[in-house]
Design a protein with these regions (language model features):
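Non-catalytic interaction/regulatory modules that flank or connect domains
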Residues: 163-252
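Tandem repeat scaffolds
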Residues: 2-178, 191
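A broad, low-specificity signal marking well-ordered, structured residues that form hydrophobic/aromatic
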Residues: 53, 180-181, 255-256
């Protein structure tokens, strides 16, 4: 089962601007409705024809924006802290790497948004409309009611890419010395994926171990995380530290995998 990435998603992984510090001079601190409205009016007036008004790098704190129309704006790398965003409509906005802290997000609309790398940790997600949204690499760990969001067939990266249950599939991982492990995930294995191309399972059978160019075959491979954990051809393997059932806890116990061979190689060799 191959993964289908857009070029923008690949670029987002390779060069995520969230890892670069924002200069203090670029930050805009908005802590009242009046300050927010004044800034919004200014950027709307300054936006070139066809361009999104620039609300990037804003620190928006303690403002009641419930039910507001904030569609078609560029909020990349902004922070909403302690705001009332109940029913706020961000549809069509650029929301990459937005951080949400201590807000009311219930019934918020992110329809058609590019919302990669957002943090929803500890937020109540009840009624958030993600129809048509791309939430690649967004953090839903420790959020509340992640299953009560609204999605549709155009929502990207909310649903798991692997079979959810009752179906076997092939998975891949890259071990020490770039040994590539081909694994069978049986139909009775627990499996989960969050909002990226990686996942975790509770059990695998090692089918084949090769070099990245597939010219060499090996009988074993060593884990890159636990030097005492080995994958051996023909053997059933279970994680030494158990399996975390919460799909949103991405970096947690389980056998981690990719669905695409080249993706696991790129991840390990980047």
């Amino acid at each position: 089962m191959a993964m289908n990435f857009t070029s923008s998603e690949i670029d987002f992984v390779k060069d995520n601007e969230a890892y670069r510090p924002i200069p203090e001079s670029d930050k805009r601190r908005l802590e009242s409705a009046e300050a927010f409205d004044a800034e919004l009016e200014k950027v709307r007036g300054a936006a070139a024809a066809g361009a999104m008004p620039d609300m990037r790098h804003c620190i928006i704190k303690g403002i009641d924006l419930a039910g507001r129309d904030l569609t078609g704006l560029d909020f990349r790398r902004s922070t909403f802290d302690g705001c009332n965003l109940h029913g706020t409509d961000f549809s069509g906005s650029q929301m990459d790497n937005v951080a949400f802290y201590n807000n009311d997000l219930t019934d918020m609309k992110l329809c058609g948004c590019t919302a990669r790398g957002c943090s929803f940790r500890f937020q109540d997600m009840t009624g958030i409309d993600l129809s048509g949204a791309n939430i690649y690499s967004s953090v839903l760990e420790d959020a509340l009611n992640q299953d009560k969001v609204i999605i549709d067939d155009e929502t990207k990266w909310y649903k798991m890419r692997c079979p959810e249950e009752g179906e076997a599939f092939i998975a891949w991982k890259c071990c020490t010395d770039l040994r590539v492990v081909m694994m069978l995930v049986p139909k009775d294995a627990h499996r989960c994926m969050a909002t990226m191309e990686t996942g975790r399972v509770s059990k695998v059978k090692v089918l084949k171990i090769t070099s990245i160019d597939e010219k060499e075959n090996y009988t074993w491979a060593q884990s890159t995380v636990d030097p005492d954990f080995y994958y051996e051809v023909g053997k059933w393997i279970e994680p030494a530290n158990g399996f975390q059932m919460d799909r949103w806890k991405d970096s947690s116990p389980g056998i981690h995998f990719f669905l695409d061979r080249q993706q696991c190689i790129d991840y390990q060799s980047k």
